[in-house]
């Protein structure tokens, strides 16, 4: 039996996001959930789902910036999909899929007594939301997709696999820090080193032996092995179309390799009612650490929630 993955209780990226564990799915595996604000007071909750190997730390700045704009009590739910962050790993690598994660989301919302919500998903998290819309459209009051669409860019999948594999063999802070900064700088050019370090430590930590450890199930890396740079993946437009029953906003980071520009443009053609934004000078995941990038999401939430009229 594989050794359980360890997440340090004092890991800085997660320390400000206390989580409760909800047991969901056929295997009854625990999922970590953080709730900011107050559920059940009539406000439409926001539920945030991170990318492929990411966790709720990617949403910390969104929560920080949204609170004074929406009100401190507005409920924002962050969660770690299974195999990520503080959630349990799935028993088998073959059990990982967007459909399984969507089924878990249904159970999570039921456990939290959430009947409808505005969902925000980055990368793979957005694909989970499309699967959720196909499975339970009544849950979707609105959706925000960030670097997410009906098809992933194979270049991004290969880059992610190569990057994560390269990191696994590095030992010692002296070697790790420059390598992590160099990798992160490709997505966030011009960012100070301290912030590059903070971004890197959202998905990894350095153990007592000086080795970099992932805050996700290493089996997720192996699932990326079949992909090549020149692969042309099949677009699942029927899943994207499942979002048609509710308002939609789409965002793409300028430097992303997860969502091709031509795919984003086709998404805009198919949903002419949807707002679309480009986040300048960033790759994936979107940092959402400035009011300029967060304000469109806040405005979307207000319109969907009925607290502000559409333009």
Language model segments and positions:
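Conserved HGGG/HGGXW glycine-rich cap/lid loop of the alpha/beta-hydrolase fold
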Residues: 36-89
């Amino acid at each position: 039996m594989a050794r359980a993955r360890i997440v340090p209780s004092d890991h800085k990226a997660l320390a400000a996001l206390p989580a409760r564990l909800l047991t969901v799915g056929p295997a009854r595996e625990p999922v970590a959930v953080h709730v900011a604000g107050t559920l059940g007071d009539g406000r439409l909750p926001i539920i945030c789902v991170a990318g492929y190997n990411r966790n709720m730390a990617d949403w910390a700045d969104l929560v920080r910036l949204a609170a004074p704009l929406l009100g401190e009590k507005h409920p924002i739910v962050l969660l770690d999909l299974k195999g990520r962050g503080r959630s349990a790993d799935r028993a088998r690598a073959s059990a990982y899929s967007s459909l399984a994660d969507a089924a878990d989301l249904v159970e999570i919302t039921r456990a939290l007594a959430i009947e409808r919500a505005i969902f925000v998903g980055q990368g793979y998290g957005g694909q989970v939301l499309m699967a959720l819309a196909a499975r339970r459209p009544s849950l979707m009051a609105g959706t925000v997709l960030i670097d997410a669409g009906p098809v992933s860019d194979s270049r991004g999948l290969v880059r992610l696999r190569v990057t994560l594999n390269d990191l696994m063999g590095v030992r010692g802070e002296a070697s790790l820090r420059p390598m992590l900064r160099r990798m992160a700088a490709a997505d966030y050019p011009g960012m100070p080193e301290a912030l590059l370090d903070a971004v890197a430590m959202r998905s990894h930590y350095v153990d007592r032996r000086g080795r970099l450890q992932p805050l996700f199930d290493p089996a997720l890396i192996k699932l990326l092995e079949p992909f090549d740079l020149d692969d042309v993946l099949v677009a699942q437009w029927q899943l994207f179309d499942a979002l048609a029953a509710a308002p939609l906003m789409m965002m793409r980071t300028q430097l992303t390799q997860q969502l091709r520009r031509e795919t984003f443009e086709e998404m805009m053609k198919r949903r002419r009612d949807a707002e679309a934004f480009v986040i300048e000078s960033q790759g994936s995941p979107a940092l959402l650490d400035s009011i300029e990038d967060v304000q469109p999401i806040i405005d979307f939430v207000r319109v969907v929630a009925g607290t502000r009229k559409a333009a």
